[in-house]
Amino acid sequence: MGSPKRVLVIDNGSYECRVGWNNTKEPALRFRNVLTKPRKDRKKEAIPDTTDGAPTPVAAEVPAEIQVGNDITNIEAVRAHLKSPFERNIITNWNHQEQIFDYIFTKMGFEGEQSIANPIVLTEALANPNFCRQNMSELLFECYGIPAVSYGIDALYSWEHYQNRRKKVSDALIISLGYSTTHVIPVLNGKLQLQHVRRLNVGGYHIITYLLCLMQMKYPVHLNAISISRMEKLVHEHCHIAVDYREELLKWGQMDYYEEHIMKIQLPYNPVTATNALLTAEQKLEKRRELAMRLLEIKNRREGEKLLEDEQQLFVYNKLRQLYEQDKLQKFELALAQQQIGNLDELDSLISTISNRIKRIKERPLSSPKPSKQQEKIDKMPKAPEGVSQADWLAELQSKREQLLQRKQTRQQQRQEQGKRHTHAAQERMRIISTLARSEKRRKANGEEEDDGFGMNDNDWDVYKRINRYNDDSDSDADNEQLLEFEKILSHYDVNFDDGNAVQTQSAAENYQLHFGVEDIRVPEILFQPSMIGSPEAGLAELIAFVLKLFTAQEQQRMVEHVYLTGGCAQFRGLKERLAREFLEMRPFQSKFSIYESDDHTLSAWLGACVQASQPNFGQTLTTRKDYQEHGSEYFREHRASNLFYPTPKD
């Protein structure tokens, strides 16, 4: 088969799907590889008066359309209902995959055509099972009628794109960091060493989920506000990989470093404005009245809508009753079945129930706001005397209030002074009371003087507190009542009045802030330490060392001279430097290695597939319909960027 002019290239990733033509510089379609089916919507329809007398149902079930990728307007609102064709990086749900293909071909201009006339380049998982490829080939050839397909691995396509822009090399160690898994892929002499590939079951999905759990545990009050979408944005824009994780942790333990590098994320909230906080009693009452009026309007409108719906339903049921009275029994039975009504008695019962409900609604008067009980309290509020302005009256009340506060403070200070041992007042009272006690003792002892040891025990001094505790209760209670009355009047007439008892609370904005600090390095660290999420697998550095040990020293050196990073997680800042440190530790002394990365980690696989689709020998990589019919659905043609074909053993 010769090289076709236009090839449809589909990078079918588990996180994002990219679709476009091979002769373009970027994909025409990019979307999240998920779909959802919204809840069914009951839409009301008009009830025409048909000529045959058969009524139309008041409400009909309108089937909900499946939304795919970019058609999902609010992905967080339907997060619980999102579906994916993937289980990790393997396609397992073929109904969902078919719906995604329908979306792709519709957006790419194939809507209404009987078959797809262009060949397709499609990415698949590394070591994709034959069963999955068999289902994919059957779907493409049988359902969509494509002429040919070429399967390839996204990481190898990305490597082809990198080589196309630079020099060609035949040996490399490709590290593919995907959404669900991470692979270490050795390539020798231009061929994939599939038997030595190793996989780490940690990817972008696990990083995002780990951050979600950490933030929800850290801020349980904002559980609903900490969503997956917000965590994805934090991971994509702010997380980075530490070159020395332990050293970075020690830095975050220092308060100065924490204050300098902490990132505060403001969650949405409804602030309390100063205008609302300084409203007078009349203004607050007016706002409550307006709110009550709005609620009553909503209630009356809903009752009106319910009344209209009942009248329409009653109209339909009366039409049904007329069919029975006109002896049109066949139409009557059909209409009953459409309305899901069992028999005539049930119909009469529904007519009676709806009629009574309509009658009650029409007889009931519209709700009106009740007179507020707060108005009586406002009317009883003291007012300025005749001949005195309100401003002068309030100033006089403020002056009297300050005098009461000063008197109260003086009494409090005196009470505290009397309770202390070393003040002059306490010593004077001690002398007087001690003298009285001795005098009383002498009278009882018939003139004999003796020291009773008063004051040697600290508990003896409590007598002053007991004596002076209630000596001014009557004056204090009267002052407190008068003070409360003054403050009540001042707060009612003066919006700027401050009674001095307001508690300084933390800003509402700060209560809705998330501190994103050590999570910056802690979350992506699970690539190197999967044990942080409870995984028993080795980290990325140990995995690379294990793969290299499967080859000879000369082969190891050839591969580490071209270490290539690809995949979405390869975008983390610091990954290249961290891997350089790990290679320096695991490689022999003074040995050389080089680490490269693509210019665009998310598009490099799609661009590499476009490069292959534009090659003169591209036709040799295509699995045609003839190959599909002759060799079976699991067969495919191998090439530099594809998996290796191992036929399924026959029983």
Curated annotation (Swiss-Prot):
Function noted in UniProt: Proposed core component of the chromatin remodeling Ino80 complex which is involved in transcriptional regulation, DNA replication and probably DNA repair.
GO (cellular component) term, any one: nucleus
GO BP terms, alphabetized: chromatin remodeling; DNA recombination; DNA repair; regulation of DNA-templated transcription
Localization per record: Nucleus
Compositional bias of kind Basic and acidic residues: 373-383, 417-428
UniProt cross-references to SUPFAM superfamilies, sorted A to Z: Actin-like ATPase domain (SSF53067)
Residue segments, region Disordered: 362-388, 404-428, 437-456
Species, as recorded: Drosophila pseudoobscura pseudoobscura
Coiled coil: 394-418
Family classification: Belongs to the actin family. ARP5 subfamily.
A Pfam family the protein falls into: Actin
Keyword Flavoprotein: no
Domain of life where this protein originates: Eukaryota
Matches recorded under InterPro entries: Actin, ATPase_NBD
Keywords, ordered alphabetically: Coiled coil, DNA damage, DNA recombination, DNA repair, Nucleus, Transcription, Transcription regulation
Subunit structure comment from the entry: Component of the chromatin remodeling Ino80 complex.
UniProt xrefs under CDD domains: ASKHA_NBD_Arp5
Protein name as annotated: Actin-related protein 5
